[in-house]
A protein has these predicted regions:
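Short amphipathic alpha-helical segments with coiled-coil-like heptad repeat character
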Residues: 32-36, 90, 142, 184
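Glycine-rich hexapeptide-repeat left-handed beta-helix
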Residues: 18-19, 113-115, 120-223
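Glycine-rich active-site/cofactor-binding loop and its immediate structural neighborhood
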Residues: 60-62, 66-105
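Terminal amphipathic alpha-helical/low-complexity segments used for targeting or macromolecular assembly
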Residues: 1-57, 62, 193, 199, ...
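Surface-exposed, flexible loop/turn segments at secondary-structure boundaries
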Residues: 72, 78, 90, 108, ...
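Short gly/ser/thr-rich secondary-structure transition/capping motifs
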Residues: 46-49, 63, 119, 159-161
């Protein structure tokens, strides 16, 4: 069993309006099937003076900036001061936190983005949770389904965890940096304050406070 990549170790629950709900789960992949019900529960209690309901089960903060060309399907919450840019494609089951950026031609599906998270340029993020201030460089994507369509298994060295999920993208801890054009394979988990080099192909778990160059070159950060 994987021990070092619990939700509590990866993210600050105070940095998402879903934090209290996520505390109910030990591992992040346990929460993925429940994102829709979390959004619906939160949406019903959002204050009308700060949020407006646009369409069925879509709540958008009045302070958020949403470009006219963006497509948003419910259930979805766009929290305060978030920016949904040109031609963003939000397919539903998406919670976009305070001050987040969802950029040009980016696609989201079944995700929670913690506050200040940025997916600003041509990113695909599906069946994933991205932590506070996590950033995905231009063109970096999450791959959320295996080519053989079997359930995703999360690997950490010799340890592993059966998720029971056919679809799981990536879990990024707070302050994670993903380099441009990287691919995060199904079941990737990246710890807090870890940097991934551009053009990387990542799978499995990467510990917090590391620099990932490739599978054979993962170095601990030194301050």
């Amino acid at each position: 069993m994987i021990k070092d990549f619990t939700l509590e170790q990866l993210v600050d629950f105070n940095e998402s309006i879903a934090g209290d709900y996520l505390k109910e789960y030990t591992y992040p992949w346990e929460a993925l099937p429940h994102i829709e019900e979390i959004i619906l529960a939160i949406g019903k209690s959002l204050p009308e003076d700060r949020f407006e309901k646009r369409g069925e089960n879509i709540w958008i903060a009045k302070s958020a900036v949403v470009f006219n060309s963006a497509y948003i399907a419910g259930p979805c919450i766009i929290d305060e001061d978030a920016e949904i840019r040109q031609c963003a494609f939000i397919r539903g089951k998406a919670l976009v936190g305070k001050g987040c950026v969802v950029g040009n031609s980016c696609e989201l599906k079944n995700v929670i983005l913690f506050n200040k998270c940025e997916v600003p340029h041509y990113n695909y993020v599906g069946d994933s949770i991205l932590g506070f201030h996590a950033h995905m460089g231009a063109g970096s994507i999450t791959s959320n389904i295996k080519s053989d369509r079997t359930n995703v298994v999360v690997h950490d060295g010799e340890d592993s965890a059966e998720t029971g999920l056919r679809k799981m993208g990536a879990i990024l801890g707070d302050w994670t940096e993903i380099g441009c054009n990287s691919v995060l394979n199904p079941g990737t988990v990246v710890g807090r304050h870890t940097n991934v080099y551009p053009l990387s192909m990542v799978r499995g778990c990467i510990a917090a406070n590391h620099i990932y160059k490739d599978r054979e070159h993962v170095a601990e950060k030194h301050t």
